Amino acid sequence: MALAKHKKASLWGAFFVVCSLLGCGPAQGEDPVALPATCSMPAQAQPVRSRSVTDGDTLRLSDGRRLRLIGINTPEIGRDGAPSEPYAQAARRALQALVEHQPLQLALGEDGRDHYGRTLGYLFDEQGRSIEALLLSQGLGYAVVIPPNDLLAECHQAAEQLARSARRGLWQNPPVLSLDELDSGGFHLLQGRVAAVTSSRHALWIDLD
């Protein structure tokens, strides 16, 4: 992301920011796990097992596939001497507790693979509960939407709202940055005023002052 007086972000990246800050989605107090209309397991889900957990949103399946969970972005674990982001290790431990030595169900996303070659999917436990929603409801990640993988977007937003309302996890003190504080790319929560919205062939862009 280029750094200038006007910062640009893709429409969906900006949508993540706006919804995280303004609370888009279901009203406060709704339990995402208890909402079958938004968090129910798709019929095409298939049984899988976890081999190992990389971080809060990525794991290795027993069949060798690397799985990136859809709809959640967890804090980054530090590498090459860099420190881990707050709650990164907590998110990893929580995912381990949910998936290790447990029968799981996997529903692939409409777009089933990312540019790193990882499988993209929705993961469910033996009771049919969304693993992503469970992590989000604990405040261990941010709900994100990247079309066309938006099947459980309402579920994930409801789960995040549950954590926000209770100020759980990273929502105890969310790291919201001003534009002047932004010094790197990647996922960030930003605050600013929308100056303009423009479009390109594959994306819309929001300029922030």
Predicted segment positions?
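Positively charged N-terminal leader segments that act as targeting/secretion signals
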Residues: A4-V17
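Small beta-barrel nucleic-acid-binding modules, primarily SNase/OB-fold domains
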Residues: A2-L3, L22-D209
